[in-house]
């Protein structure tokens, strides 16, 4: 898949009204004959799959809720996050032709992980000028634990300019988006604008402030093409929560990766998710007492640490501004490249 630059004229209209019933319409997934077998998944060695710029291989057992989005023709085109047993959150621009997902895999090329067919999918209404998110409902529940969305006290205590996030995905590993590996990648990035209030030219005004945030790493470390829809995890004393969904590169990025990424804040779309799915999503439990002075204390050094209420549960969880916006969508090059 070629690098995708999307230029759109952004209207000043706001996002879909969550009180009016304007939630969009679910679309059925592809027909049954398009479903991949385990043997077909194991045969994906021809692909040019992908990873994060400046990252490292995810260890087995970490970030099992990170999903590779599979399309017709055995193609992986985006990344996502399992937020309920049968619900994956990803980018709105990743919704065309979804076949299913692979979760609980750190190397898609070896056929490992759990393949689950999609039942239906939906993009946020007018995602290109509001929230660039989409949902995939699965045919059956995943066996790995879903990730809780950062909300309420977790955001109050840990989401600020300078906070550290973990970015995980199946995107390119070089700034030009030409080199790929089979292994799931992760890295650490710094939040530079936690509510998209200081970089107005990079953010979509209709959902700012509070609908998006910006993060970047040192020495060009960043998400890249193929990480679209993937998770940004906020690491806290209370566990690791998904706080963002990869949308696009900043204006400084041009056609390269490494200058920062704009994320949709996951908490901003919780009402939409709950209305469409009928679920009451899990919420973090707020601890007593003030937050740590530096936002973190005594976190495990191991990547992908996942603790809820102080209990390590890794054993059951393998874990645009106004006018014309040159929005660099971080689409993942495919298992097989589309003609």
What positions do the PLM features span?
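Hydrophobic h-region of N-terminal signal peptides that target proteins for export
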Residues: 3-13, 331-335
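Protease-domain processing segments flanking chymotrypsin-fold serine proteases, especially trypsin-like
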Residues: 10-89, 98-105, 109-111, 122, ...
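C-terminal subregion of chymotrypsin/trypsin-like serine protease catalytic domains
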Residues: 20, 77, 81-95, 99, ...
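Chymotrypsin/trypsin-fold serine protease catalytic domain
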Residues: 24, 29, 37, 111-121, ...
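Active-site-proximal beta-strand/loop segments in catalytic clefts of secreted hydrolases
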Residues: 69-72, 83-85, 91-94, 103-106, ...
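Short, solvent-exposed loop/turn segments that connect beta-strands within catalytic domains
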Residues: 74-75, 109-112, 176-178, 236-241
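Terminal processing/anchoring signals of secreted or surface-associated proteins
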Residues: 316-318
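A cross-kingdom C-terminal cell-surface attachment/processing module
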Residues: 321-338
């Amino acid at each position: 898949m070629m690098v995708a630059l999307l230029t759109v004229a952004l209207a000043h209209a706001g996002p879909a009204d969550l009180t009016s019933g304007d939630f969009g319409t679910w679309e059925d997934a592809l027909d049954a004959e398009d479903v991949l077998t385990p043997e077909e998944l194991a045969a994906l060695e021809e692909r040019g799959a992908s990873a994060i710029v400046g990252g490292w291989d995810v260890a087995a057992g970490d970030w099992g809720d990170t999903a590779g989005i599979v399309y017709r023709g055995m193609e992986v085109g985006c990344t996502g996050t399992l937020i309920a047993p049968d619900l994956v959150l990803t980018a709105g621009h990743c919704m065309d032709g979804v076949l299913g997902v692979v979760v609980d895999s750190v190397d898609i090329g070896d056929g490992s992980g759990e393949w689950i067919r999609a039942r239906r999918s939906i993009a946020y209404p007018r995602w290109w000028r509001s929230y660039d998110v989409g949902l995939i409902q699965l045919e059956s529940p995943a066996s790995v634990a879903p990730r809780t969305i950062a909300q309420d006290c977790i955001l109050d205590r840990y989401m600020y300019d300078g906070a550290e996030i973990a970015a995980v995905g199946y995107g390119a590993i070089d700034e030009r988006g030409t080199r790929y590996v089979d292994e799931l990648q992760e890295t650490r990035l710094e939040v530079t604008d936690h509510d998209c209030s200081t970089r107005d030219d990079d953010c979509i005004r209709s959902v700012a402030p509070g609908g998006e945030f910006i993060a970047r790493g040192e020495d060009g470390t960043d998400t890249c093409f193929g990480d679209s829809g993937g998770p940004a995890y906020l690491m806290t004393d209370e566990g690791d929560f998904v706080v963002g969904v990869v949308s696009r590169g900043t204006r400084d990025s041009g056609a390269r990766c490494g200058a920062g990424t704009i994320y949709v804040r996951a908490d901003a779309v919780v009402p939409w998710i709950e209305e469409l799915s009928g679920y009451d999503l899990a919420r973090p439990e707020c601890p007593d007492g003030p937050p740590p002075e530096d936002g973190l204390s005594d976190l495990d050094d191991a990547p992908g640490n996942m603790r809820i209420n102080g209990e390590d549960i890794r054993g059951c969880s393998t874990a645009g501004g106004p006018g014309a916006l040159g929005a660099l969508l971080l689409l993942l090059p495919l298992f097989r490249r589309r003609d």
